[in-house]
Amino acid sequence: MASRAEPVDTGGRRDWRDVARDAADLALLGILLTLAAAPVLTAAAAVGVASAAVHDWTRTGSWPSARATLRRFGRAVLPGVPVSLLALAVAGLLAADLAALAAGRVPGGPPALAVTALVAAGLAGYAGLVVVEVGGNGGGRWRVAARWAACACLDAPTRWAALTGVTALAGLLAVLVTPVAVPILAGYTVAALHAVASRRPALAGVASRRPVSAGVAGGRPVYAQPEVP
C-alpha cells in the first residue's frame, strides 16, 4: 500500500491517480479484512487491526508495514474472541427479531418493527464508533474503546447519528451490490467511519476521559487530563 502524502495539482486538487491509488488501497484492505475475519472468531481482531491501519493512514499518510500489521493481529486475536462472539449473538438476535416482526409471527406490528429497527441502527452506530476508537489504541483494546464510545455517544449524539447513517448506508449497499463487492465495501466503510468521526469531535468532557496510550503504567490505559487554564 502506498503513501497518500503526495502533492496536489495547481488547482488544489489531488491528482486522479492518487485518488485511484487510495481507492485501490482501501479495496485491498477490505479484502484482507474479510479473509482474516473468515474464521469468525478472528472477526473482531480483523476489524480492529483494519481500523488501526486506517487510523495510521489518516494520521501519517502511510500504511503500517505488513510486519507491524501481523504483530497487531497476533496480539488482538485472543482479546477479540469474546467480542466476536458477542457481536455475532447480538446481530443474530436482532436479525431474528426483525424477521419475526416483519413476518407477523410475534405481536407488535409496524410500531414494534420500527422501534426494533431504530435500536438496531443505533447499536450499529455505536459499534462503528467503537471500531474507530479501537483503531486508535492499536486494534485490540475493546473494553476501553467500548467505554469511551458509550460516553461519546451520550455526550455527542450528532456524531452518533452520523455514524449510524454510515453503518445504515453500508448495510444497504451490502444488500444491493454483488456479493463479490462486499469485501471491497468493508474497507470503504472503515475509512468512512474514521472520516465521519474525525469531522465530528467529541465534547471536551469526553475527550478528557479518552485513553491516550498503553505504553506506560505496565500497559494499562492512561487517560488524558483536562488542561488547566
Task: Annotate each PLM feature.
Residues 1-116, 124-229:
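Helix-coil boundary and N-terminal low-complexity module in membrane systems
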